[in-house]
């Protein structure tokens, strides 16, 4: 069985993340969405909220394939989380050349530390290429319409966060 790990902060999960997740499911039997926990960062959504939003969004978009997705937390190196969960592939989404430059550096470092783990780059669909979680949070905080950029449940959760 092929297991892929897809790591990020997912604060919040966006349509771009879901696009990468769909691509990962075409490559692997099981995809682990690994939410990085950084003690120095204060995310908008708690870990439990992010797990719930990823799971609800996956079910809404992926239907029966959502059963092939699990969500975990990790702190430290993603290669350690990948090893712990038996992943052979590390999936990374690419929006543009800037992402590619950064991800190539990371793939090189990860490849040196974990040669058994293959990094796979998935180019973003043009329809979601401009979406970032940071921009989504900024737009939502200013009362803008974020529905084109995030799953329905995420839009509702963001609207609730910024109305309170």
UniProtKB/Swiss-Prot annotation:
Location(s), subcellular: Cytoplasm
Organism superkingdom: Bacteria
Keywords for the protein's UniProt record, in alphabetical order: ATP-binding, Coenzyme A biosynthesis, Cytoplasm, Magnesium, Nucleotide-binding, Nucleotidyltransferase, Transferase
Positions with a binding annotation for ATP: 9-10, 17, 93-95, 103, 128-134
Gene Ontology CC annotations of this record: cytoplasm
Catalyses which reaction(s): (R)-4'-phosphopantetheine + ATP + H(+) = 3'-dephospho-CoA + diphosphate
Site for Transition state stabilizer, residues: 17
EC number: 2.7.7.3
Main location, first listed in the record: cytoplasm
Disulfide bridges in this chain: none
Class of this enzyme: transferase
Binding site for substrate: 9, 41, 78, 92
A Pfam family: CTP_transf_like
Keyword DNA-binding part of the UniProt annotation: no
One GO BP annotation of this record: coenzyme A biosynthetic process
Pathway info: Cofactor biosynthesis; coenzyme A biosynthesis; CoA from (R)-pantothenate: step 4/5
NCBIfam families referenced in this protein's UniProt entry, alphabetically: coaD_prev_kdtB, cyt_tran_rel
UniProt subunit comment: Homohexamer.
Recorded family membership: Belongs to the bacterial CoaD family.
Function per UniProt: Reversibly transfers an adenylyl group from ATP to 4'-phosphopantetheine, yielding dephospho-CoA (dPCoA) and pyrophosphate.
The protein's name: Phosphopantetheine adenylyltransferase
Species the sequence originates in: Brucella canis (strain ATCC 23365 / NCTC 10854 / RM-666)
């Amino acid at each position: 069985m092929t297991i892929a790990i897809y790591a990020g902060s997912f604060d919040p999960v966006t349509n771009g993340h879901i696009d990468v997740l769909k691509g990962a499911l075409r490559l692997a039997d099981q995809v682990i969405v690994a939410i990085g926990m950084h003690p120095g960062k204060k995310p908008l959504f708690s870990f439990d909220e992010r797990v719930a939003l990823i799971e609800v969004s996956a079910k809404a978009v992926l239907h029966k394939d959502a059963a092939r997705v699990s969500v975990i937390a990790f702190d430290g190196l993603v290669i350690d989380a990948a090893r712990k969960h038996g992943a052979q592939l590390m999936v990374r989404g690419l929006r543009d050349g800037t992402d590619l430059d950064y991800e190539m550096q990371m793939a090189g470092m990860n490849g040196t530390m974990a040669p058994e783990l293959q990094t796979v780059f998935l180019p973003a669909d043009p329809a979601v290429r401009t979406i970032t979680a940071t921009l989504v949070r900024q737009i939502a905080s200013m009362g803008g319409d974020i529905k084109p950029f995030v799953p329905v449940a995420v839009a509702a959760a963001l609207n609730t966060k910024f109305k309170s």
